[in-house]
């Protein structure tokens, strides 16, 4: 099956004279319906990479294909219609005076007929559980609610791919959980491809696969289990340890023998219960 996204030897410089490219020889592919997290410290190139995928930035070298189309000036608008982006600060994304007006904005720009527009706005708000807030002013919403409305605005456009560019980084834990649960629900319903750009290791744990960026290069990729088993190597890259790994470190310091393989939070709970019952 042909990947929905293919990058081959991508290079990008913000200035031609830059000695160190923002992206250097980056290659990977993503399948339809996959959730891929791209992690790395600040300045690693992960957000630059996201902007090349939907054509906000054009690479200096290499090729990008989205939905089988090569990214170039002739195809860039077709590709942008396939890729929706949710950015870091929800307040910077609102243009409508009410929630429903804001969700309708992108549809108006595409010239969608009014009857279809009303239907799409209703459907999108229902899917992110914000239909009861349709007449509300965006400024009166919580951070998590604002991001759910931003997601609804993207969902209404019916893209094949959603990119979350640090979309949960300004939210409290409750808001972050709201957004992740919303994305999981929509992904399962529509077989959407999700790319999350994040430095939040716990958010990345929701992905099928993780790509690790460092100094503009792709340095590692694999399942969350594979990546998180690196342990202290993540800390050396400027990243945090996921909660289960932190718990394992704390238990080891107290003389408890813990599994060497990576465990999810659910797996850690199961292991703890089994350990207690076997004593």
From Swiss-Prot:
Q: Does the keyword Mitochondrion apply?
A: no
The question of whether Cell membrane is a record keyword is answered with yes
Q: How does it sit in the membrane?
A: Peripheral membrane protein
One Pfam family, short name = ABC_tran
Protein name, as recorded:
Energy-coupling factor transporter ATP-binding protein EcfA1
User: Source species, please?
Assistant: Enterococcus faecalis (strain ATCC 700802 / V583)
InterPro entries reported in the protein's UniProt record: AAA+_ATPase, ABC_transporter-like_ATP-bd, ABC_transporter-like_CS, ABC_transpr_CbiO/EcfA_su, ECF_ABC_transporter_ATP-bd, EcfA_1, P-loop_NTPase
Q: What is its EC number?
A: 7.-.-.-
Highest taxon above the source species:
Bacteria
Q: Which Gene3D superfamilies would you find in this protein's record?
A: P-loop containing nucleotide triphosphate hydrolases
Every ABC transporter domain range: 5-240
Q: How does it assemble?
A: Forms a stable energy-coupling factor (ECF) transporter complex composed of 2 membrane-embedded substrate-binding proteins (S component), 2 ATP-binding proteins (A component) and 2 transmembrane proteins (T component).
Q: Where is this chain's protein located in or outside the cell? A: Cell membrane
Q: Which SUPFAM superfamilies does the annotation name? A: P-loop containing nucleoside triphosphate hydrolases (SSF52540)
User: What does this protein's UniProt record list under function?
Assistant: ATP-binding (A) component of a common energy-coupling factor (ECF) ABC-transporter complex. Unlike classic ABC transporters this ECF transporter provides the energy necessary to transport a number of different substrates.
Sites where the protein binds ATP: 40-47
The entry's keywords: ATP-binding, Cell membrane, Membrane, Nucleotide-binding, Translocase, Transport
In the record, the note on similarity to other proteins reads: Belongs to the ABC transporter superfamily. Energy-coupling factor EcfA family.
Q: Name one GO cellular component term.
A: ATP-binding cassette (ABC) transporter complex
**GO MF assignments:** ATP binding; ATP hydrolysis activity; ATPase-coupled transmembrane transporter activity
């Amino acid at each position: 099956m042909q990947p929905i996204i293919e990058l081959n030897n991508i290079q990008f410089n913000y200035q031609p004279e830059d000695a160190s490219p923002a992206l250097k020889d980056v290659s990977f592919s993503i399948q339809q319906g996959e959730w891929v997290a791209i992690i790395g410290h600040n300045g690693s190139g992960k957000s630059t990479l996201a902007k090349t995928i939907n054509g906000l930035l054009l690479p200096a070298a290499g090729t990008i294909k989205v939905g089988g189309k090569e990214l170039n000036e002739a195809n860039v608008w077709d590709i942008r219609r396939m890729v929706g982006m949710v950015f870091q600060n929800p307040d910077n994304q609102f243009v409508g005076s009410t929630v429903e007006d804001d969700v309708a904005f992108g549809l108006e720009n595409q010239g969608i007929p009014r009857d279809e527009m009303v239907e799409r706005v209703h459907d999108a708000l229902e899917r992110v559980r914000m239909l009861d807030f349709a007449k509300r002013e965006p400024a009166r919403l919580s951070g998590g609610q604002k991001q759910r409305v931003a997601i609804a605005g993207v969902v209404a456009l019916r893209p094949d791919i959603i990119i979350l560019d640090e979309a949960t980084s300004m939210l409290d834990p409750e808001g972050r959980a709201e957004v992740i649960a919303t994305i999981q629900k929509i992904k399962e319903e529509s077989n959407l491809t999700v790319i999350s750009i994040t430095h939040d290791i716990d958010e990345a744990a929701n992905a099928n696969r993780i790509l690790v960026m460092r100094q503009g290069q792709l340095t590692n990729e694999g399942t969350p289990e594979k990546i998180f088993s690196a342990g202290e190597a993540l800390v050396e890259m400027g990243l945090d340890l996921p909660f289960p790994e932190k718990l394992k470190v704390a238990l080891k310091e107290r003389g408890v023998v813990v599994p060497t393989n990576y465990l999810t939070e659910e797996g850690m709970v199961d292991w703890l219960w089994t350990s207690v019952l076997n004593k």
